[in-house]
Amino acid sequence: MMRILLFLATNLAVVLIASITLSLFGFNGFMAANGVDLNLNQLLIFCAVFGFAGSLFSLFISKWMAKMSTSTQIITQPRTRHEQWLLHTVEQLSREAGIKMPEVGIFPAYEANAFATGWNKNDALVAVSQGLLERFSPDEVKAVLAHEIGHVANGDMVTLALIQGVVNTFVMFFARIIGNFVDKVIFKNEEGQGIAYYVATIFAELVLGILASAIVMWFSRKREYRADEAGARLAGTNAMIGALQRLRSEQGLPVHMPDTLNAFGINGGIKQGLARMFMSHPPLEERIEALRRRG
C-alpha cells in the first residue's frame, strides 16, 4: 500500500508540473485566442482520476480475473506428489524472498508458461501450466517459480499498473486537447462539442494509446530482466539459464496466455521488426546473455 501511495504522490507532482509547464508556455492563452475555452487544470485532474481508476481497479481484481481467464485451480490440499512439491518449493522461495506465501495454482495448458499477479506482494498468486510441470525438470520448474516470485517481491504488478495509470492520464488529456483544437480551430464549431471533437478525440486516443503501449512494454521488458536476476539469486544462475534455454526450445508452440497476464508470464512469445517495441518480454536470447554476463 505504501508503494501505491508514494507512486500516486509522485504522479500528482508530475500532473502539477505538467499543468504549470503548460501555463508558463502560454498554452492556455493560445487555446483561448483560438476560441477554445478549456480549463487545463480541471481537464488534467479529470483525466488523472479516470486514468488511474481503471488501472488500479484492474490491479485489485487481477487475481480473480487471472483465475477465471486461465481456469487456474488453486492448490489448497495437495493431492499428488507434484502438487506437494510445488507448494513446498513456492513456500521456500517466498521465505527466501521475504514475502508471504502466495496462492499457488495450476492452469490447464500444454505450453510451458507461468504467471504471477496480485495487488500486493503479500497477497499474490503464482500459477504454472500443466505442460511446464510435465515436461520441465524440477530445477527448471524451480527457476521459473523463482522468476515469478521475483516479480512479486519486486512489486512489478503494482509498478506496471501505476505506470499504465500515468500513460492513461496523458493519453486522455492530450487526446481531448487535440479534439477541442480540431473542433474549434479547424472546423470553427462555436456550439458546444461537435462531431469533429468526438472523431478527433477517438482517433487521437487510438494513436496515442499505441505509442503509450510501447512505453509500458519498455518498462515491462526492464522488469523481466530484474525478475530473471531475482530468479538467478533464488534458484541459481545455471538453473535460470537452463529454464530460459528450455523455453527457447519450445518457442514454436502457441502461447494462450491472456494479454492481461503476458507481462507477468515467463514466456512472452516472439515478434519481429517494429512489433518488438510492443513485446512484454525481451527475446529469450537476450535474457540468457544478460544472465551469462551477470555470472
Curated annotation (Swiss-Prot):
Which EC numbers does the record give?
3.4.24.-
UniProt GO MF annotations: metalloendopeptidase activity; zinc ion binding
Q: What sections of the protein cross the membrane?
A: 4-24, 42-62, 158-178, 199-219
Chaperone recorded as keyword: no
Gene3D superfamilies found in the cross-reference section: Metalloproteases ('zincins'), catalytic domain
Give the primary localization class: membrane
List residues binding Zn(2+).
147, 151, 224
Q: How does it sit in the membrane?
A: Multi-pass membrane protein
- Cell location: Cell inner membrane
Establish whether keyword Iron-sulfur is in the entry: no
> What GO biological process terms does the UniProt entry carry, in alphabetical order?
proteolysis
Q: What is this protein called?
A: Protease HtpX
* Gene (name only): htpX
